[in-house]
Amino acid sequence: MHQITEAHARELAKQAQRKDDLRAAIESDLVGVHRILFEAGCGHGHWLTDFAEANPETLCVGIDLISWRIRKGNDKKAKRGLKNLHFYKAELGEFLEVLPKSISFERTVLLFPDPWPKARHHRRRMVQPGFLSEVAGRTDRGGEFCFRSDDRPYYDWTVECLNEHAEWQVDESAPWPYESETYFQSLMDE
């Protein structure tokens, strides 16, 4: 018989509470919604806030693991009075688990994720076959996965992963959905 430690039991309880809280927030915020623009790893929300402001007809959702980034995104949302934008502190798997199946992605955006440049760390990269399958499973027919990286090896890795995936086709000539400098791009300019 296997037993879990008290610390592990506490962690499982925290995870369950986090999912319950996330589910309640999503159910409250996304009533009657069927399609969203989704940004995984939205950081401070700069790009998504600008996009939402320029595209008020599109419902935008961003997730990130770091609480203060989500707070900054929500501050930007409030300052601009945007009703079509929501930020959630969530891990991708938990978000997809609690997101109602009736909601699909018209577009998924992934901007400048950590490239994990050392070969032994590549398994930590966000773009992996499993990630692409999960996102494809929630994406509308004709939906897009938009990716940018300032790390050429990671960009090439992503193109290779997409080319090898049955659900995605790479179109490097497709126009970018919206140009707006991200927080991390602005750091590079300094």
Please state what every model-predicted region is.
Residues 165-190:
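Class I S-adenosyl-L-methionine
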Residues 66:
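Conserved SAM/SAH-binding beta-strand->alpha-helix loop
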